[in-house]
Regions:
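Glycosyltransferases that elongate glycans
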Residues: 1-454
Length: 454
């Protein structure tokens, strides 16, 4: 007897699942019938009314209500979601075939956005199940705070212990502040080796937490020594300072970690997060130039270690890369109240996004989003640029006067970046990165107009 089996190479990496909502559709059709009947009655009975003006106003209101209702039904009519299969991805592709990804984490105030929360977000991203040499993490500090820089340095040192621990024991929650307070971290049917390493890791994290807390309460810890690592932060005004870029980790078994504080000048508008994202795009283009970019808010940790593999299912699951420009993961909130009485868990938003996904695609929510760099650079799905056909004059007008920026943009737009490996160390590219992080770099270019995230 023959056994019917399916080759894993033939199975889809991702598929769109249409939700069954026949009952909801039937209800909507009944409501539509009532609305149409009411409008017909208003129109037919209009001449027989003594109070024609109120009747006419009521008709206008009901027409407007019906119009809004129809728009709402268009979203509710088709509901779909995307299901991905990372296990099939791992069987089909080798790790060296995965694309490189630049990760952007943005923060603007160490008081309003506590450093320990930002560092937990970073740790969860450094520990994802993805080849470390394919990742580069950029932290944008719009406060130009030595506290944030100090926290990032200490966190990177802790990550050298935390990341191997997570991967060795397949830890599912890789933000330490959530892991060590969750029931999943409790000892139950585990080895003595795990218990010992767990306690060691807990002590190391507590030490990191205490260092950051002490530093945040005692700013004088950062002495203004021009020979120290904090020399660039001496006498800095957060709203008026030169760009600071530091490579904290490079080729150490972890993803690259780069600290960025873009140049600010009181005479030039910095455009808040939009400006920070454009600087991150330029600096990463000069330094690592990954074809994919992920932007994450500082308080949005990765709650699934395979999140990048799920993302790659969408990347490789489409026959044509022109089918998508960006995709994002929904935001979820921990420690919410049961049944969400205040509606702050955004459950309704998920429902709306499922409906929009069935029409064309979700709107950009501002975080947890993977972007194709060439799309951010202004290349529309129908544009085809052959290698060598991009004029240097055009690149100068669009991307600015940085030779390194123009060269990296040409690689991305021509599609040749996947074949060209950057042989330079990141430290040797800091000068070029500082240049593109200037507050006036985008003047006279398409940055913020045709070339931008926001």
């Amino acid at each position: 007897m023959a056994i019917n089996t399916q080759d894993s190479t033939c199975l889809p990496l991702q598929e769109k699942i249409v939700h069954n909502n026949k009952t909801a559709r039937a209800v909507e059709l009944v409501i539509l019938a009532f609305l149409v009947s009411m409008l017909i009655y208003r129109v037919v009975s209009f001449k027989d009314q003594e109070h024609s003006l109120p009747w006419f106003l009521a008709l206008l209101c009901e027409l407007w209500f019906t119009f809004i209702w129809i728009l709402t039904v268009c979203i509710k009519w088709n509901q779909c979601s995307t299901k991905t299969y990372p296990d099939r991805l791992l069987k089909r592709l080798n790790e060296f075939e995965f694309p490189t990804i630049d990760i952007f984490v943005t923060t603007a105030d160490p008081i309003l956005e506590p450093c320990i929360i930002t560092m937990n977000t970073i740790l969860s991203l450094l520990a994802v199940d993805y080849p470390a040499d394919k990742l580069a993490l950029y932290l944008s500090d719009d406060a130009c705070s030595p506290l944030i820089y100090y926290s990032l340095v200490e966190t990177t040192m802790f990550a050298k212990l935390w990341v191997p621990f997570c991967k060795k024991y397949n830890i599912q929650v890789r933000a330490p502040f959530r892991y060590f307070t969750s029931k999943s971290s409790r000892f139950k049917d585990v080895s003595l080796e795990f218990q010992h390493e767990w306690k060691t890791m807990k002590n190391e994290y507590d030490d990191l937490y205490n260092k950051i807390e002490v530093a945040s309460q005692r700013p004088f810890t950062f002495t203004c020594d021009h020979n120290s690592d904090f020399a660039d932060f001496c006498d800095v005004n957060r709203s008026d300072h030169l760009a600071i870029i530091k490579v904290i980790s490079e080729s150490t078994g972890l993803p690259h970690v780069i600290y960025i504080s873009r140049e600010k000048n009181s005479q030039h508008h910095h455009h808040y997060k939009a400006g920070a994202m454009n600087v991150l795009t330029r600096v990463s283009g000069v330094m690592t130039n990954a074809p994919l970019m992920l932007n994450v808010d500082c308080d949005m940790y990765a709650n699934n270690p395979q999140v990048f593999l799920h993302a790659m299912c969408i990347v490789f699951g489409h026959k044509n890369d022109q089918d998508w420009g960006f995709f994002e993961f929904p935001q979820a909130f921990y420690d919410g109240l049961k049944d969400d009485p205040f509606g702050n868990q955004l459950d309704n938003l998920y429902y709306v996004e499922n409906g929009i996904a069935a029409l064309q695609g979700p709107f950009y929510g501002g975080s947890n989003c993977f972007h194709r760099r060439k799309v951010i650079y202004g290349l529309s799905p129908n544009d085809k640029i052959k290698n060598g056909s991009i004029g240097n004059e055009d690149l100068h007008k669009v991307f600015g006067n940085s030779h390194e920026m123009r060269e990296s943009a040409a690689q991305i737009l021509s599609g040749s970046n996947a074949k060209i490996e950057n042989q330079k160390s990141l430290s040797s590219l800091i000068e070029a990165a500082i240049h593109v992080a200037g507050c006036t770099y985008d003047y006279g270019t398409d940055w913020g107009k045709k070339v931008n995230v926001y």
